[in-house]
Amino acid sequence: MRTAYYISDGTAITSEVFGHALLSLFTIEFEHITVPFVETEEQAKQVVKKISESFQDDGQRPLVFYTIVNTEVRKIISKSVGINYNFLDQFVAPLEIVLGVPSKPEKHRTHSIHEKTYDIRIEAVNYALANDDGSNLQEYDEADIILVGVSRSGKTPTSLYLALQYGIKAANYPFTEEDMGDILKMPPALKRYKDKMFGLTIEAQRLHQIRSERRANSRYASLQQCRMELREVENLYRKEKIPFLNSTRYSIEEISAKILATTGLQRKKY
């Protein structure tokens, strides 16, 4: 197994995102080690020592992805035995040439509370939590989007990801067996918000597996029940012309990106 380090003088989120994106292209198993807030030369030396230990243990040079502003700290990391990828050097220098202005790197700027849209993200997260699972319908006027679907189809994690990553206020509403009766109809409380709605669906077998982890051997988790509920919600989506997505084979990140591409919603984070 190859070891990959993600190092930064901040949260290391940027290093992780870039590094994971690159490594996901390879069918190799990695041990991922994240080291945030490396801000002093002494801390950098400790990290270099740890990289050397990984090399001795694995017999392979670790991959080292890092974003560090301080020049001296960066030099120390660059001298590790790992195969080093300095994202600042890789991308910033060419951008300075293209843009015609020098960069002004600052620690913690990318993911800090001083980021001007920080409050937007926090407000969106609070909104998603307060409007989870059909609660607070009176606040739906504020929603940028309302995710609908059967229980355990991915509405809550997607709502939270949209809030945290994009600053989007996402409410979610579950269609339950009680809503269905003989046939599922649009709940009266949702009719005025139809233009904000986006549906999630999922393969019945996968829904059965997810529900069984929560309530094994229950009617709620039975394959027959899952098939019935999914059939009803998909019929409603088509009848009401609600855009929808089958989430079975997608990650939360992919689901969120597809929702934005389909609806035209714009991120508010930057």
UniProtKB/Swiss-Prot annotation:
Its EC number is 2.7.11.33, 2.7.4.28. Pfam families: Kinase-PPPase. It catalyses: [pyruvate, water dikinase] + ADP = [pyruvate, water dikinase]-phosphate + AMP + H(+); [pyruvate, water dikinase]-phosphate + phosphate + H(+) = [pyruvate, water dikinase] + diphosphate. GO terms for molecular function: ADP binding; ATP binding; phosphotransferase activity, phosphate group as acceptor; protein serine/threonine kinase activity. ADP binds at residues 149-156. It is an enzyme of class 2 (transferase). InterPro entries: Kinase-pyrophosphorylase (IPR005177), PSRP (IPR026530). Keywords: Kinase, Nucleotide-binding, Serine/threonine-protein kinase, Transferase. Belongs to the pyruvate, phosphate/water dikinase regulatory protein family. PSRP subfamily. NCBIfam families: PRK05339.1. Bifunctional serine/threonine kinase and phosphorylase involved in the regulation of the phosphoenolpyruvate synthase (PEPS) by catalyzing its phosphorylation/dephosphorylation. This is Putative phosphoenolpyruvate synthase regulatory protein. The lineage of its organism: Bacteria, Pseudomonadati, Pseudomonadota, Gammaproteobacteria, Alteromonadales.
